[in-house]
Amino acid sequence: MRDYIVNTVLGNYKCVIFYDTSTICDVLVYTCVDPSRQSIYGYSPSYRQVEDIVLKLKPKIIIQLADECPQEHNEVHNLLGYITNLFLRCHRHESQLYTYTSKVEAIPLGYSNYIDLPLEIKPPQDRKYTWTWTGTLRPDRKQMIQEFWRMWNNATFAFTNLNKEELGTIYNNSVFVPCGRGNFSLDCYRQYEATIYGAIPVVMSSVSEFEATFKFFDELPPWIVADTWEQAVTLCQQVQFDYPKLLELQTNNLAWWHRMVSTMHSKITQALSLEVVQNLDILELNKSKVTPPQSVVYYPGDTKRDIDNRIFAC
């Protein structure tokens, strides 16, 4: 995630990274999950801690990571849009839109630190695998794999950890990439990683959930989407050997991604060009209207590890 923020979201700008909260900065990046426990995401500050830092450092841009679980009701963080020029968040929750100010924007989740950006994009006809699955095979993903067996020819699986080069090679040699749900929502890195490498993400979702999750900058990604995995596989089979159509799908996906990045850069450039105006009265007025955070979600794999307490800014 750090690579995505530094190399893509802020890729047009020179970044000097500080792992402290005492240095004046233009961009503040922090993780937003339930702060009452250590989690797989690492240290997460409370809303009050983040607000205090923002009031002190006056960053022009805030980038919020995590916050995948709307059940935790972290929407109070969206009010930080009243005291910064631009608040970018990596998940979009329909239930939180009532707290969005004009300065709050949901951006694509992006890619993990376990993958490099591709140097070239292979056209569909030059790809070795019809479809690919890499990752943990959770129970909800077994049905997905069972349905994709109908397209058995030239498939590949990897259930162990792959290095950056191996994962990139697999994506760049795959036509379709079935994308199961993330830990707590439809959104996950795999959809964007496949897109960036020119593979075609395949998602099972209702229209309403897909729109609620992925409507970034008022535009939906042009992935293959179906109500069931059976329907999704049928859609893939219909275009499996239609290489002009596959190339069109690939081109549309890549163009969508480049538009998302370009829009992010435009908004960031504008935000950096302005002085910060902190509307404290409006901030305080709206706090009482927001559902407070709740400790209701347990993340699989949570431990009490000693994790460095840090927020990074640049």
Protein language model regions, located:
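Short helix-start
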Residues: 229
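Nucleotide-sugar donor-binding catalytic core of glycosyltransferases
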Residues: 1-225, 235, 239, 245-246, ...
